[in-house]
């Protein structure tokens, strides 16, 4: 009966890449390949027809064809001149985002004094920015998944630039409240630059490159403080708002150089455009393109919220939402607390200052002094060691443990602030706390694009960013309003939140260290091959000895 089916001779070895595609190349020694054999059987296969005569679907094409996926092309082309240019351009977007965020801690006390605003209106001025970011983050993610990463990013940057400059001309409080809210709406799309950036990076360089992009965030925060030192005393806050939009203007001019993500193009069926993009990158990097045919991924609905809550991603999504919430809640809370603590001298000084203020005037205020700006600059510089520490540990401990460690150290530093310490020790504790909470934020930006597939990557990052904005929305009322009632309760809230976030990081079901980016919502490419004739008897074995 076996002779009726086929004559046993020799079974040619087929090499399957981790992404699912395959090739006949015998000298292909790339890591992650496995030889698949049937023990004890040597077969010469003859062509057979399907019983029903149906054609094999395109996505189930013959795995012995010379084919490659975008992941293979990105890995083969490697990191080069193109990625360096993209790093600088993406970094400009991050620098602009950081400056718009940092300006809140500088603008709030200035307007508090200049316009005689009560504390709740000062807090609302900060919160309205985060309301805009929260309401738009998911929208920008959906636009990026539906219409392309470049499209979503370009529109959001132009939007932010326009309303950022307009807000400098606000005549009264209500106007600046509305305009800064619209600025926040645009900033909600800036994190999509990470989605675009990550999809052009080879696996080994991805974590390091995304973390190094965060250096631009640190540069942005430091530059904003330095700019405020020189601009605020002479030109005032309006010029500070205008000059803070310069990085956005540069990005808006240069963003037309950006290509669309090849992964997005393949997923949306634009094979020719994806190949053209990959050839452009290969030319700029001076690297060869892989031989063979680019596989077109099975076209799926993109940017659907329900895909974030499939059984495979449900817990990941919920835990990530809380992690991002805690990151932003604690990070921006610390930024706002820093100016309050420096003005008071220490934690105990806030209580004594509160009594003096109440006796004098409910609208009493203090402008930031030169000493306050310098100490603010020192704590802002902590962003740089935060990047370096995270860069060193993220590929050693993994993404989950890195986030957990950062949350724990921030929580510990927050508890130490309960002690009435001098200004120097206060600055040191704030420096360490900010370094590690920014490191946790950076690790989350590495993990999130890695854990979601291309079809929902932008939406996943967008919803996480939206939850971060919820935390940032709430934090002014803790760091600026609750602080007046109880300093210790305020610090306890931040410390407790980060301890819970550390636990959430440990319970994330997927560790993405060493994983390639997924193209499909299917966990493994082999699941897309279900239905294809693979009925050979025997045991499947890989060179590594593990079953695939």
Curated annotation (Swiss-Prot):
It comes from the Eukaryota. The keyword Cell membrane does not apply. GO terms for molecular function: transmembrane transporter activity. It is a multi-pass membrane protein. Residues 1-87, 144-156, 202-209, 260-316, 395-401, 446-457, 511-548 are cytoplasmic. GO terms for cellular component: basal plasma membrane; synaptic vesicle; synaptic vesicle membrane. GO terms for biological process: xenobiotic transport. Residues 109-122, 178-180, 231-238, 338-373, 423-424, 479-489 are vesicular. It is found in: Cytoplasmic vesicle, Secretory vesicle, Synaptic vesicle membrane. SUPFAM superfamilies: MFS general substrate transporter. The chain crosses the membrane at residues 88-108, 123-143, 157-177, 181-201, 210-230, 239-259, 317-337, 374-394, 402-422, 425-445, 458-478, 490-510. CDD domains: MFS_SVOP (cd17441). Belongs to the major facilitator superfamily. NCBIfam families: 2A0119. This is Synaptic vesicle 2-related protein. The gene is SVOP.
